[in-house]
Amino acid sequence: MLLRTLGLMIFLVFGLHVLHAQTKTTQTENIVLITFDGLRWQELFKGADSLMVDDTGLIEQPGSLLKDFWHPDPLERRKRLFPFFWSTMASQGQLYGNRAYGNHVNNQNKMWFSYPGYNEVLSGFADDTRINSNSKVNNPNVTFLEYLHKLPPYKGKVMAFGSWDVFPYIINRERSGIAVNAGFDLATGSDLTEVEKTVNRLQQEIRGPWGGVRLDPFTHHYALEAIKKHKPKILYIAYGETDDWAHDGKYDQYLWSAKQTDAYIREIWETLQSDPQYKGKTTMIITTDHGRGITKTSWKSHGSEIPQAGQIWMMAIGPDTPALGELKIQGQWQSAMLARTIFQLLGLDYPDAKAAPAVKEMKK
C-alpha cells in the first residue's frame, strides 16, 4: 500500500510538470529582479533635480555636476543620468511611474521604508502589522523566491545578492535555504574563481562609509560572477548606495551612484544576452523599495511622515513583455503586483491568494 501511494505521488508530481511544460505559453525561463534602493521617480523620468544639482549644501564642489548631468530639457537630463534605461529599456521594454502622465506606481504598504518595501516586492503584499521596522527579524511571509526554490526546476537555482545586511532576514535564508550573499558576506566554497577571491579581498580592505551596507561594486561583481559560474534561473540583485548617499545629504554621490548602477544593470543585461541559457529566455524587472521627499530637506528622508515617499516606479524587459517604452497611460500600479507577475511570466500560478494581481501590461 505504501509503495502504491508513493508511486501515485511520484506520478502526480511528474504529471504536473509534464502538463506545465505542455501548456506553458511564455518564453521566459529565467527571472532577474533588481531593486534600486530609494531612487526617486523624479530622477528616473526628469534627470537631475534643478533645485539640488548645484546646491552647495548638497554637493561637494559647486558646478561639478553640470557638465555630466545638467541640461535644460529633462528628457536629455534623464538620458545623461540613465543612458541604459533611456536607450535599451525605453526601446525594448517598459517603464512605469511618470506621474506627469497620470502613470502612478505606489507602495501598497504605508510604512515607506526599506524592509516593508522589500517584503512587498518579494511576497506580493504589504504586511504593516508584522513588517513595521528595519530590524533583523526573519520574515514570516514566504517570498516568491522561496516558493520557486521549493519547485524541482528551480531548486538550488535561486540566488540573491544585496548590499544591505538585512536581506538574509527579509528573504529568510534560515527557513528558505536560498543562497543569499548580503551585507559584508564573502563568496564561499572550495572552487572560488579568481574574480571572487579578488572581490573577497577588496571587500575586506575597503569598508565604505556605512556600518550595515557595503558599497554596490561588491554586490554587483558577486552577482555578475554568479551568473557566469552558477547560472541561476532566478536571480535577485539589490543595490543600496543611492538611499544611503541620500540620507547623508550628498546629492552628488547620489547621482553618481545612480548612473553607475545604470551601467551595472547594462552589464548584467548584456551578459545575459551573450549566454544561450539566458538570451531570449530571460525577463528582467527593476523597481525600488520606496520613494523620497521633494524638498532639499525632505529629499534626504522617507517614511510615512513624508507624503511623496510612497511614490515609486518599475520597469521590465524580456521576451514576453511588449516593447511599450515609457507608459503614458493613466493608471495605478503597485510594487506588490510584481510577485504574481513573475509567476505568470514563468507560466505558473502564484500560490498565495493575498498577493496583489499581476501587471497585465507586462505580459503579452
Task: Show which residues each predicted segment covers.
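Active-site His/acidic residue clusters
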Residues: 173-175, 221-267
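Bacterial Sec-dependent N-terminal signal peptides
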Residues: 1-27
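Short, structured active-site-proximal loop/turn typified by the sulfatase FGly-forming signature C/S-X-P-X-R
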Residues: 42, 46-111
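Short, solvent-exposed loop/turn and secondary-structure capping segments
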Residues: 42-48, 100-101, 132-134, 161, ...
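Acidic, His- and aromatic-enriched active-site or binding-groove loops in soluble protein domains
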Residues: 123-137, 177-211
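Membrane-interface soluble catalytic domains
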Residues: 22-27, 151, 165-176, 270-280, ...
